[in-house]
């Protein structure tokens, strides 16, 4: 499946919630009618079936983290094999992706931009270049901007925006050095309450 390259706001309107696909700290519902579906007339959404609700939640989370369908299913399979709550395991696996960690640290304005920074070899993990967005970051790994990339205006702009956002407690960032430490995996209480991972588990359990 190809990666979606169309308007980002359209995806958020389709899911009925801010997927944080656009840069900035202003809530997306101040920019567009989030309650209305995409399209000229922006028709209100009809009542979904149980399956439809589960599918929408899966699509919402998949798009939020910028993961393709096959990748997302594989993350679910890995989460199901781990001890503990499968839904929480799934979110932790997604949060541990390098592109997501780069975004959480504020080096990229969006996850898509952070993915690009990784792919363009602008990111170091423990001093070594890693250009795989799905690379699994471990506790106490140090993620930093490569020296020759530190003057990129988009990175500086992203850090300025990140200063206005709530800082994740599981990550420590030195904006001056453009480096951060992934202290631990986030607890469920650290993450968005707008995500209902139980619906995703129910969908894949059928």
From Swiss-Prot:
Q: Which NCBIfam families match?
A: PRK05327.1, rpsD_bact
At the top level, the lineage of the source is: Bacteria
Q: Which GO terms describe its molecular function?
A: rRNA binding; structural constituent of ribosome
Arranged from A to Z, the UniProt key words for this protein are: Ribonucleoprotein, Ribosomal protein, RNA-binding, rRNA-binding
GO terms (BP aspect): ribosomal small subunit biogenesis; translation
Could you state one GO cellular component term attached to this entry?
Answer: small ribosomal subunit
**Which residue windows are transmembrane per the record?**
none
Answer yes or no on keyword RNA-binding: yes
Q: Subunit details for this protein?
A: Part of the 30S ribosomal subunit. Contacts protein S5. The interaction surface between S4 and S5 is involved in control of translational fidelity.
Recorded protein name is Small ribosomal subunit protein uS4
The primary gene name is: rpsD
The family annotation for this protein states: Belongs to the universal ribosomal protein uS4 family.
Ribosomal protein as a keyword of this entry, yes or no, is: yes
Q: Which PROSITE patterns match?
A: RIBOSOMAL_S4, S4
Q: In what residue span(s) does the S4 RNA-binding domain sit?
A: 96-158
Q: What taxonomic lineage is listed for the species of origin?
A: Bacteria, Pseudomonadati, Pseudomonadota, Gammaproteobacteria, Vibrionales
Q: Which SMART domains match?
A: Ribosomal_S4 (SM01390), S4 (SM00363)
* Record-linked Gene3D superfamilies: Ribosomal Protein S4 Delta 41, Chain A, domain 1, RNA-binding S4 domain
Chain's role: One of the primary rRNA binding proteins, it binds directly to 16S rRNA where it nucleates assembly of the body of the 30S subunit. With S5 and S12 plays an important role in translational accuracy.
């Amino acid at each position: 499946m190809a990666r979606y390259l169309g308007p980002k706001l359209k995806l958020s309107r389709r899911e009925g919630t801010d997927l944080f696909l656009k840069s900035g700290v202003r809530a997306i519902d101040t920019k567009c009618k989030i309650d209305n579906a995409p399209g000229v007339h922006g028709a209100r959404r009809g009542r979904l079936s149980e399956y439809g609700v589960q599918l929408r939640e899966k699509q919402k989370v998949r798009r939020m983290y910028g993961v393709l369908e096959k990748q997302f299913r594989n993350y679910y399979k890995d989460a199901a094999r781990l001890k503990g709550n499968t839904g929480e395991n799934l979110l932790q696996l997604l949060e541990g992706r390098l592109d997501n960690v780069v975004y959480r640290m504020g080096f990229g304005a969006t996850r898509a931009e952070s993915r690009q920074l990784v792919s363009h070899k602008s990111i170091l993990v423990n001093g070594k270049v890693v250009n795989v967005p799905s690379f699994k970051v471990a506790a106490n790994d140090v993620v930093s901007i490569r020296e020759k990339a530190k003057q990129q205006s988009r990175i500086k702009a992203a850090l300025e925006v990140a200063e206005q956002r709530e800082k994740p407690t599981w990550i420590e960032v030195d904006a001056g050095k453009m480096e951060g430490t992934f202290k631990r995996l986030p607890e469920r209480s650290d993450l968005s309450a707008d995500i209902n991972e139980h619906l995703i588990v129910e969908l894949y359990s059928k």
